[in-house]
A protein has these predicted regions:
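Structural detector of well-ordered beta-strand residues that form the stable sheet scaffold
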Residues: 27, 65, 86-87, 133, ...
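Short acidic-hydrophobic, aromatic-tinged amphipathic segments that line or gate anion-handling sites
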Residues: 43-48, 117-121, 149-150
Length: 235
């Protein structure tokens, strides 16, 4: 099977390394010739945000996937129409790319998430209470495009762009769960990890696994994960 991956970073490398036990060929599209995947795959240097380059790269592949969400959805939609299997599908990637769509997705499927307000510009009336977090609708990555507005005096710093304004959550610990599903409907959950972030950079510093959580918390995580999988399958 010929598997194409948009993006050649560390996540792509880990994916390929784990899959080397299978008889598949892996192809990478990435703008950097020195990306992490370049020396363990069939490498194509190119722009995964360019519609035509994504189409040209993926048209002869059996499966196309991503290791970064900032890719050309339009290109992936064309590939789907040509019969190429895109995982995750272009509809889910569209939701992943836009914070507003993410929040609306959670709301539609009753997936727990902090209260929020959507704005298109900084001129709109702010009705959500302080403190809140502003998250730019698109383009945020690795701590960028996110800021905390603590009080009314800080509104002068509000970015003038489509955004989600979200209640600031008093976090005890941040947990992460990876869950996978195959075409037969089998679901595999990997161990929950605790994510420890750098408070200044808003970047992941390190992960703790196994994490120490109560049984009732684990049950809530499992229920939310199951609800999310069902919602994603409906898209």
């Amino acid at each position: 099977m010929k598997i194409g991956i948009l993006g050649g970073g560390q996540l792509g490398r880990m994916l390929i390394q784990e899959a080397l036990k299978y008889d598949d060929e892996f192809y990478i599209l990435d703008p950097s010739a020195n990306c992490s995947c370049a020396n363990i795959s069939y490498f194509t240097q190119g722009n995964f945000n360019n519609k035509q380059e994504v189409i040209d790269f993926g048209k002869d592949k059996d499966v196309v996937s991503i290791e970064i969400e900032h890719v050309s959805v339009e290109g992936l939609q064309v590939l789907e129409n040509k019969g190429v299997k895109v995982i995750p599908n272009s509809r889910i990637i569209t939701i992943i790319q836009q914070k507003i769509l993410q929040k609306q997705f959670y709301e539609e499927f009753d997936i727990p998430s902090p209260a929020f307000q959507v704005i298109q510009s900084s001129d709109e009336e702010i009705v959500i209470g302080f403190p809140f977090v502003q998250k730019l609708n698109t383009g945020g990555y690795d701590g960028k495009g996110v800021q905390i507005i603590k009080a009314e005096k800080d509104l002068v710093n509000l970015w003038d762009a489509p955004s989600v304004l979200e209640n600031l959550v008093d976090i005890e610990k941040e947990l992460s769960l990876i869950i996978a599903k195959n075409e037969q409907g089998e679901i595999k959950s990997f161990p929950v990890t605790e994510m420890v972030a750098d408070p200044q950079l808003n970047l992941l510093d390190f992960n703790i696994s196994p994490t120490q959580i109560a049984e009732d918390i684990q049950k809530q995580i499992d229920q939310i994960a199951e609800k999310f999988m069902k919602a994603a399958n409906s898209e």
